């Protein structure tokens, strides 16, 4: 018996579901691949993996092509998971995972995982106009030089400005607070108020895609001039974090110029990808920071090679 089956046996599950976890059940998913405008993507290469826990004989891996309607089928026996990845020149890859490892969400009927023959749509974003952006990844940690005071931060160089770093432009002001003791509280406030009409807005990543963020910044979006994130750990309770999550990012505008009426003339645009970390000795880090060095250019489709 598989090591996790005693846990399943303690739950109220049907005999068919239990047998599906013991001996596997047939999975079938019909995929349709479309581009970001909804057009079918034919002749794309779909790579399919079936993984079974404790049943290596059911593991499988193969490749196929999407047909003229952008469709392909994944079908095999499993007790755990289906993973697919789709690639084609001129497009960003996309992926999907179907997990059968949840007794509350899954069911088996006649030896088949339900819904058998489920239809799913995958979106392959087109490569439009990738450009070279200044790029800093999550390995670039910045120790917090001082708490309780506003610190200038250069988003292009991803560093504090003088006297704490090599940054040259106060693209955003950062305020860190830290309270240690029986309870622990850490906050970071990001303010763009030193640049008129600068700010940021928050979006969800397209986690399925090789391009998880937007192609371009929206110059007409509502840009918040400040945002605040916190981490609280009260004695005897689990920590509570209100931060930029792994599946989120900020689109920002800074180094703005306005006319005599206060109307926007130009600015620089970029992206801060979560997760945002500002707790602990490591200091400040993000998944990555992108900065378009070309004034007025809203293009954020980064050329990563």
Positions of predicted regions on the chain:
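Bacterial N-terminal signal peptides
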Residues: 1-7
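Short beta-strand/loop motifs in extracellular/secreted proteins, especially
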Residues: 29, 42-46, 82, 186
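A short, solvent-exposed loop/turn motif at the edges and junctions
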Residues: 54, 77-107
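Surface-exposed, beta-sheet-biased, low-hydrophobicity segments with strongly acidic/polar composition
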Residues: 107-109, 114-118, 123-305
